[in-house]
Swiss-Prot record:
Keyword match Metal-binding: no
Source organism superkingdom: Bacteria
Gene Ontology MF terms in the entry: ATP binding; D-glucose binding; glucokinase activity
Residues that, per the record, bind ATP: 8-13
Protein name per Swiss-Prot or TrEMBL: Glucokinase
Organism: Yersinia enterocolitica serotype O:8 / biotype 1B (strain NCTC 13174 / 8081)
Record-annotated membrane-spanning stretches: none
GO biological process, one term: glycolytic process
Main location class: cytoplasm
Length: 323
């Protein structure tokens, strides 16, 4: 009889829950719930378990916020809870609450060639450090290292490092955003809201008034080539994604690869392929040659957060991770 654990991937908007086969890591019966419809994460979990008529002893939930102790307060949601209290209330033997990009990073050892697209570089070097980042509601970042055949995720809040412009155009963008925001982090330009910030800053720096656009509007107009400012914004987004990814690669010499996750880039994949992303990734002056061989991958797996939450839990339970 198959033994299942509960896994979850919770963002600022939705909570995705599923079952993970403990022996194999296979994810099944995934369902997405709107976070606006429930007063707490615990209520969502109880609803899922009731609907699927399943009892579990182990669970791992990935959440889009820092995890620094027993008390968890979500960054982009009103939900807050005690891990110990939730474990007791749900009757679980084992509950892990991890950062969302810890989960995404832990999915990487489970990915097959069919789950990724490569953007330049050569083959990854086995056992070498890995970086993963992704733009969605915010900008998530993590690294992954292999120690004694176990994968260790190094989560952090890398999306909140300073935005570091490296061109005259980016200097103008920073000047506009600094006037509005004060501190300008990388997330302020590499995220859904960040894409809008880029569009607005481009228009304002030209002495004009921007329209009130949503991220979807900027992307659609850019792809339709119906708005020069939107196309400039999307092009700049791709370039800054490349610069940021190159910075991550330098941090830990990630010859195991740099992986991109998140909900934004897959919406304009062909545009991204033709953009200045890879050139910006390698544009590190004296260290250009150092970065040329490092492969970059787009994660195309539909649920890397769930897959990684399961992988994290299974490794805690003593299993070895592989696709």
């Amino acid at each position: 009889m198959t033994s299942y654990a509960l896994v979850g991937d919770v963002g600022g908007t939705n909570a995705r829950l599923a079952l993970c086969a403990v022996a194999t890591g296979e994810i099944s019966q995934a369902k997405t719930y709107s976070g606006l419809d429930y007063d707490s994460l615990e209520a969502v979990i109880k609803q899922y378990l009731s609907e699927h008529k399943v009892t579990v002893e182990h669970a791992c939930i990935a959440i889009a916020c820092p995890i620094t102790g027993d008390w968890v307060a979500m960054t982009n949601h009103t939900w807050a809870f005690s891990i110990a209290a939730m474990q007791q209330n749900l009757g679980l033997k084992h509950l892990e609450i991890i950062n969302d990009f810890t989960a995404v990073s832990m999915a990487i050892p489970m990915l097959s060639e069919q789950d990724v697209l490569q953007f330049g570089g050569t083959s990854p070097q086995p056992g070498k450090p890995v970086a993963v980042y992704g733009a969605g509601t915010g900008l998530g970042v993590a690294h992954l290292v292999n120690v004694d055949s176990r994968w260790i995720s190094l989560p952090g809040e890398g999306g909140h490092v300073d935005f570091a412009p490296n061109s005259e155009e980016e200097d103008r963008i920073l000047a506009v955003l600094r006037q509005e925001l004060g501190h300008v982090s990388a997330e302020r330009v590499l995220s859904g809201p960040g894409l809008v910030n880029l569009y607005r800053a481009i228009v304002i720096s030209d002495g004009r008034l921007p329209e009130n656009l949503a991220p979807k509007d900027v992307t659609e107009r850019a792809l339709a080539d119906s708005c020069t400012d939107c196309r400039r914004a999307l092009s700049l987004f791709c370039v800054i994604m490349g610069r940021f990814g190159g910075n991550l690669a330098l941090n830990l010499s990630t010859f195991g690869g740099v992986y991109i996750a998140g909900g934004i880039v897959p919406r304009f994949m062909e545009f991204f392929k033709a953009s200045g992303f890879r050139g910006a990734f390698e544009d590190k002056g004296r260290f250009k040659d150092f970065l040329q061989d490092i492969p970059v991958y787009m994660i195309t797996h539909q649920q890397p957060g769930l897959l990684g939450a399961g992988a994290y839990l299974r490794q805690k339970l003593g299993y070895t991770l592989h696709p």
